Amino acid sequence: MFAIIETGGKQYKVKEHDIIRIEKLNASVGEEVTLSKVIALTGVDNEVIFTQNASVTASVLEQCRNDKVIIFKKKRRKNYRRKNGHRQYMTVLRITKINNME
């Protein structure tokens, strides 16, 4: 059984015991979080079930930052160069349970 969840403006296909990296959540390490925006579920024989009351429970493993992304702007012949960097805050989750409340 797997679920498709949405968090941080992105969609993730998850199963139980999966480890995913998502946009930062306000939760401390070891805390249980519930992701309630479930788009689709699969049941036995991989048929798709659409449920409104489904949720996914996960535990927070780590709060970290992603790799640095370099932003570089240049206008030729004008001596205009700008270099900037950005590191996005991330949360690492372990999916513990997929709740199907029909």
From Swiss-Prot:
InterPro entries: bL21-like, bL21-like_sf, Ribosomal_bL21, Ribosomal_bL21_CS. One of its GO terms (biological process) is translation. The keyword Transport does not apply. Keywords: Ribonucleoprotein, Ribosomal protein, RNA-binding, rRNA-binding. GO terms for molecular function: rRNA binding; structural constituent of ribosome. The keyword Hydrolase does not apply. Pfam families: Ribosomal_L21p (PF00829). It comes from the Bacteria. One of its GO terms (cellular component) is ribosome. PANTHER family: 50S RIBOSOMAL PROTEIN L21, LARGE RIBOSOMAL SUBUNIT PROTEIN BL21M. Belongs to the bacterial ribosomal protein bL21 family. This protein binds to 23S rRNA in the presence of protein L20. Part of the 50S ribosomal subunit. Contacts protein L20. HAMAP family: Ribosomal_bL21. This is Large ribosomal subunit protein bL21. It comes from Ehrlichia ruminantium (strain Gardel). The lineage of its organism: Bacteria, Pseudomonadati, Pseudomonadota, Alphaproteobacteria, Rickettsiales. The gene is rplU.
